[in-house]
Amino acid sequence: VHLTGEEKSLVTGLWGKVNVDEVGGEALGRLLVVYPWTQRFFDSFGDLSSADAIMNNPKVKAHGKKVLNSFSDGLKNLDNLKGTFAKLSELHCDKLHVDPENFKLLGNVLVCVLAHHFGKEFTPQVQAAYQKVVAGVANALAHKYH
C-alpha cells in the first residue's frame, strides 16, 4: 500500500493510542452483528444469538484482539503486506474458506470503530489514511484467492 510520510505518521500516531483488546472485540462483534452471514465462520464461538450476546462473547473479544494484533504487524510492514499476511491468507482461503469480501467489511467496520473511539481526533485525513491501509490489508489477505 502506498502511503505518504504524513499518512504513515497519522496512522501510526493514532494506532499507538488504540486499546487493541477493546477495539478488536468491538470491531469483530460489530461485523457479526451488522453482517450476520459472517457468523457462519464462528460456529465454535458459542452464543451469537443477539447483539448483546455477540458483543459480550469472550471468544469474539479474544479473536478480535488476535485480529488486531495481526493488523498491528501489518502496520509495521506496510511495504510488504502480502508477505506479512501470506500465511493468514492461505489459512483463510484453503482451510477456513472465508469469503475474501469479508476482509473489506471488517476493515470498514474497524474504521468506524476507530472513528467512534477517537472522535474529533479521527480527522478526515486520518480516515483517508486508514481506508488505504484497511484496503491494502484486505487485498493482502485475499491474495491466495487469486
Curated annotation (Swiss-Prot):
This is Hemoglobin subunit beta. The gene is HBB. The keyword Iron applies. One of its GO terms (cellular component) is blood microparticle. Involved in oxygen transport from the lung to the various peripheral tissues. Pfam families: Globin. Red blood cells. Heterotetramer of two alpha chains and two beta chains. Keywords: Acetylation, Heme, Iron, Metal-binding, Oxygen transport, Phosphoprotein, S-nitrosylation, Transport. The lineage of its organism: Eukaryota, Metazoa, Chordata, Craniata, Vertebrata.
